[in-house]
């Protein structure tokens, strides 16, 4: 730890156990001890080795207020915390560790983080879970009738805020609520039903820890930070991305550009991609030459031929009995 962090300028301290009990009946001494160990000792390990000039930015959680008995809205950063379960208690302890450390810190108390992710989306977060169920035409159970109030925040805005705090040298040794939406569970379910009317909403009397609360975001907005993403559009995206897709199972598929616009200046041809681009390469080949290429089963590659013509020969090398396929690909 010392080797990595001793001369670091900024630390985004995200480490922690996130598979945590949501209600008392889910808790156990073994789980609680693991959550506490990783949170408290892990954080202290970082604080012990970073320099005074290093800025540490740590996500805390709205759950530090889970012990509030009555519905309360617009909770400020300086209100007394009331954690109950191990996760909230560990984050509450982390906040005190940073405040007492004498180091340059920023604490962001996150609402429930929602939004589509290309890698490991947190399905245990209510808006994400509801969107996943809605994408499969499932039933959304509304515990306590869905009356609980939730403070939510978009995933991409959380990432943007971490970068914002990293770059703002004038913000230090401070804590901010990072929430955007205050809604009920039922309102989230109704948005899901708007984008997939096939789902069923079922109200139940199951246990809930409380009827909810919300955090004020006035302080974070006063820094100049702006939220750019919306709950309804995020839910629509998650339902769409997680719904059944008519996927092309061919090893390779050739498709011409679409939505063409042609005039005297030339032609515009469009190719719509369904996923983020993480790399772009340019290949130039001379006439009569040969190139070899490979990609792994979990990858997708998309190639746009802008000039000339190629003859392709390809095969699934994981399957020795697969056929060798030959095809001609033209520009565009």
Per-segment meaning from a language model:
Residues 1-38:
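NAD(P)H-binding glycine-rich loop region in Rossmannoid oxidoreductase-like domains
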Residues 13, 44-84:
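Conserved Rossmann-fold NAD(P)-dependent oxidoreductase catalytic core, especially the SDR/UDP-sugar
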Residues 30-45, 81, 85, 89-90:
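Glycine-rich NAD(P)-binding loop of the Rossmann-fold in SDR/ketoreductase-type enzymes
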Residues 96-150, 155-159, 164:
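NAD(P)-dependent short-chain dehydrogenase/reductase
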Residues 138, 143-256:
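C-terminal substrate-binding subdomain of Rossmann-fold SDR/epimerase-dehydratase oxidoreductases
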Residues 247-277, 292:
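A short, N-terminal "cap"/entry segment at the start of jelly-roll beta-barrel domains
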Residues 298-317:
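Glycine- and acidic-residue-biased ligand/ion/polar-headgroup-sensing regions
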Residues 317-332:
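Short acidic-glycine-tyrosine-enriched beta hairpin
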């Amino acid at each position: 730890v010392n080797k990595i962090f001793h001369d670091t300028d900024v630390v985004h301290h995200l480490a922690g156990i996130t598979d945590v009990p949501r209600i008392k009946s889910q808790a156990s001494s073994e789980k609680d001890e693991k959550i506490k160990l990783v949170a408290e000792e892990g954080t202290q390990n970082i604080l012990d080795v970073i320099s005074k000039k290093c800025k540490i930015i740590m996500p805390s959680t709205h759950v530090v207020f889970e012990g509030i008995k009555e519905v309360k809205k617009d909770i400020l950063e300086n209100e007394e915390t009331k954690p109950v379960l191990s996760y909230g208690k560990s984050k509450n302890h982390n906040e005190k560790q940073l405040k007492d450390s004498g180091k340059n810190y920023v604490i962001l108390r996150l609402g429930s983080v929602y939004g589509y992710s290309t890698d490991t989306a947190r399905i245990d977060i209510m808006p994400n879970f509801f969107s996943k169920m809605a994408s499969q035409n499932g039933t959304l159970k509304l515990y306590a009738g869905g009356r609980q109030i939730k403070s939510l925040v978009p995933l991409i805005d959380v990432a943007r805020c971490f970068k914002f705090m990293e770059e703002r040298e004038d913000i230090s040794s401070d804590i901010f609520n990072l929430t955007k939406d205050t809604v009920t569970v039922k309102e989230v379910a109704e948005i899901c039903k708007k984008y997939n009317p096939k789902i069923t909403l079922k109200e139940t009397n199951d246990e809930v820890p409380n009827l909810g609360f919300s955090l004020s975001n006035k302080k974070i907005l006063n820094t100049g930070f702006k939220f750019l993403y919306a709950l309804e559009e995020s839910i629509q995206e998650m339902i769409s991305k997680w719904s059944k897709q008519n996927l092309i199972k061919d090893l390779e598929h050739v498709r011409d550009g679409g939505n063409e616009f042609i005039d005297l200046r030339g032609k515009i041809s469009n190719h719509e991609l369904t996923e983020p681009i993480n790399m772009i390469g340019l290949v130039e080949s001379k006439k009569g030459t040969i190139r070899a290429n490979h990609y792994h089963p979990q990858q997708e590659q998309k190639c746009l031929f802008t000039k000339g013509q190629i003859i392709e020969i390809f095969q699934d090398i994981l399957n020795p009995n697969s056929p060798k396929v030959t095809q001609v690909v033209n520009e565009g």
